[in-house]
Amino acid sequence: MTYETILVERDQRVGIITLNRPQALNALNSQVMNEVTSAATELDDDPDIGAIIITGSAKAFAAGADIKEMADLTFADAFTADFFATWGKLAAVRTPTIAAVAGYALGGGCELAMMCDVLIAADTAKFGQPEIKLGVLPGMGGSQRLTRAIGKAKAMDLILTGRTMDAAEAERSGLVSRVVPADDLLTEARATATTISQMSASAARMAKEAVNRAFESSLSEGLLYERRLFHSAFATEDQSEGMAAFIEKRAPQFTHR
């Protein structure tokens, strides 16, 4: 499939989606949203892909939603079109996803990064939800995912003031998985994605599902759900291979079945 606002690359078992609207600091208009979602879904459906990286440019991962596109919307327009609903499909991708963030990740850009399972930030990254400065509030999950990631007090601080935080503060707050020098960002993201992609695909998807369930259920429900997924893993060929390889002191050869 041909895309106009993103670049898509396959590198062995890793899929890489690069936002490519440099003239607009990768602002997320409807076309970008649709293309990112379409590419992620396509990669998710590919059995030869075991991890997906989403990244932007050195200056901006994504500087937010495209304000020019939204400025003249009425309530009826936004509500009827269910604006931003497209991103729900991206969040539902089962393949592990990695956000590789350099530069600005603001508003929708921060929300896009938070939809990913692992968030690796360059030391140049800046995060924030500045929507309040425009007379609105986060609409792509910012108020929900940010609060779950860094807690109510910190989320309130960022959302109500619209201020940004640098990569170091984001790491201390628990928003990002790790911070690396900007020149090493894609190397680190590719290495992490390659490591994940070499694991059993079914086990990786189950693990992702179990962790996500922790935010959506009580502890007892989450423990039961995890246990059922653990039991299910014993129906896979990869479980037999993984445990046999451990006993035989060799590297496992997963077939993702």
Swiss-Prot record:
Catalysed reaction, written as an equation: a (3S)-3-hydroxyacyl-CoA = a (2E)-enoyl-CoA + H2O; a 4-saturated-(3S)-3-hydroxyacyl-CoA = a (3E)-enoyl-CoA + H2O
PANTHER family hit by this protein: ENOYL-COA HYDRATASE, MITOCHONDRIAL (PTHR11941:SF54), ENOYL-COA HYDRATASE-RELATED (PTHR11941)
Gene Ontology BP terms: fatty acid beta-oxidation
EC number, UniProt record: 4.2.1.17
Biological source species: Mycobacterium tuberculosis (strain ATCC 25618 / H37Rv)
The encoding gene: echA8
Record InterPro entries: ClpP/crotonase-like_dom_sf, Enoyl-CoA_hyd/isom_CS, Enoyl-CoA_hydra/iso, Enoyl-CoA_hydra_C
Enzyme class: lyase
Molecular-function GO term, any one: enoyl-CoA hydratase activity
Purpose of the protein: Could possibly oxidize fatty acids using specific components.
Protein name: Probable enoyl-CoA hydratase EchA8
Lineage, uppermost ranks: Bacteria, Bacillati, Actinomycetota, Actinomycetes, Mycobacteriales
